[in-house]
Amino acid sequence: MIKIANAPCSWGALEFDLEGQAAGYSLVLDEMQKTGYEGTELGDWGFMPTDPVKLKEELRKRELTLLGAFVPVALKDRSTHAQGIESALKVARLLAAVEGTTPFIVLADDNGKVPERTLNAGRVKPGMGLNDSEWEAFAEGAN
């Protein structure tokens, strides 16, 4: 059987500011449940409760599973790697407390705060990519 899940970003809860206000986590979870989704991604840290007991209860009463979390890290910048590790571990501890070992982390480049990337979304050209030094830092950060 295929199970389908969604993420708070589908309701406008994003790691970077966009126009408008995102719905609160209760509405998002209610609508996920009513639509028939079986699980959710965590969303940005603080969007859903960060107390594992509270989060587990919110998910349980809607019969939803916590599948994973998106953790953005500015991978091309070595100075952010230590903080990225801390963020990933903080999220991993919450996921483990709520669902055990089944959820996963999606480690992604935090390019949502890079104006050149956001202003050219969907139209990024090769010249806007990383240079050799940034690729090396990116690879180190991802490993």
Predicted regions and their residues:
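Active-site groove signature of glycoside hydrolases
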Residues: 95-127
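N-terminal pre-domain/capping segments
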Residues: 1-100, 127-143
